[in-house]
Amino acid sequence: MKLTREKWENNFSEWFDWVIREAEIYDYGRYPVKGMGVWLPYGFKIRQAAVDLIRKLLDAKGHEEVLFPLLVPEDLLRREGEHIKGFESEVFWVTKGGEENLDIRLALRPTSETAITYMETYWVQSYKQLPKKYYQIVSVFRYETKATRPMIRLREVSTFKEAHTLHETYEDAERQVKEAIEIYKNFFEELGIPYIMSQRPEWDKFAGAIYTIAFDTIMPDSRVLQIGTVHHLGQHFTKAFDLKVQRKDGTLDYPHQTSYGISDRVIAVAVSINGDDHGTILSPVLAPIKAVIIPIPAKDEKETEKIIEYSEDVAKILVSNGINTVIDKDTEKTPGEKYYIWEIKGVPLRIEIGPRELSSNSVFIKRRDTLQGISVKKENLVSEVVKLLETLRKDLKERAWNFLRSKIRYTDNLEEAKKMLDSKAGIVEVPWCESNECGLKIEETTGARVLGKPYDSPRDVSKSTCVVCKKPAKTTLRLAKTY
């Protein structure tokens, strides 16, 4: 069966809304507050698998989970001036308690650098207590004024993993940035999500950071989505809160910090990146259900009962071997109707069991990504399912990476860059001298967003000149249409 991706690529926004609704992943647009949605049971399980994975990776590197209050006093938020300027217009403020006006406005947490640094002034006094590595998985709130989109641009980001670390020296914090990058690389690799890493330009780094490294991916409509960030904060926040620690030589100094975050966007990408016109295709790493069994009724009622019993036995074997499996016993739907809904949901494997399979002591297994099937004897069931799931995982990952690579272009002509971006090129790289003035000019001329310069594996531009000033290029600047 030939699988098409026309809706997926050419009308992605509609496709995405259709999938999250019909697959019962996320209910968006009906809750009576703009920019806030509801995780439905199936979607919540997908979300939980991602949360469990990031917890495992952070815990393995010595991070400790905490849980801070939702409300942040205004004076705390304003303590680091550059930080609050970066998103003051996006803050939700609580101004009343019951009928009483509050003396100090309270912000619904937009991020937690200020709150955590404030508490660390009580917790940390000596280098012997360092490094500190905290993280929490919470809701954060931003008053988005642009058009909101489910999971992608929200006013309540309900799956915000933020890590915050404290270090004696700049170099220690620098090493932590590299560790955070490796954690995220492992996270995205495990989920099969392709990415590029860029150092954000000075004018677009995190407010209060020395520098920001961002992970971006390309969505089916060729727009770029930021899926993770890592910030070296230096001493900006520790100085603002007068947080000093005793160093090894007995002197007092301000420690250095990092922070790094990911959000619901990871789930949006996982649902989208390998989809087709039949629905989403979930990696076995995230799929709450690894296999769905569809019993095919026989003409004879007694034989149909035997098919159901046989299906239950097959499910029991798989579940007992750690492969989460369900049987669709809905008698109101035809097998074809069942195929339709489980394909939308992206369940990796479909197991069809009818009279033929019953008589031959076998099952017929179809992969969701290809809809190609094979007949498997019952005694080989577990080994074949394990093999198919692993092959499917690898194939999905390879396909996603191939899609991303096909969407990265290079040109040394600014007008050509604009044309490429207008024709859904994805990411376009141009030679750049690294000056802010030229970078802003490139952004203005193309009407695109500057992602920054490559963090790793940069192109050789030693013989190129900046597309604006024509001075020798030092690196490339990445441009894209973004969300």
Swiss-Prot record:
GO cellular component: aminoacyl-tRNA synthetase multienzyme complex; cytoplasm
SMART domains with a match to the protein in the record: ProRS-C_1
Pfam families assigned: HGTP_anticodon, ProRS-C_1, tRNA-synt_2b
Enzyme Commission code(s) on record: 6.1.1.15
Subcellular location: Cytoplasm
Catalytic reaction(s) noted: tRNA(Pro) + L-proline + ATP = L-prolyl-tRNA(Pro) + AMP + diphosphate
Quaternary state and interactors: Homodimer.
Function comment: Catalyzes the attachment of proline to tRNA(Pro) in a two-step reaction: proline is first activated by ATP to form Pro-AMP and then transferred to the acceptor end of tRNA(Pro).
Protein family (similarity comment): Belongs to the class-II aminoacyl-tRNA synthetase family. ProS type 3 subfamily.
Domain remarks: Consists of three domains: the N-terminal catalytic domain, the anticodon-binding domain and the C-terminal extension.
Listed name of the protein: Proline--tRNA ligase
Source species: Sulfolobus acidocaldarius (strain ATCC 33909 / DSM 639 / JCM 8929 / NBRC 15157 / NCIMB 11770)
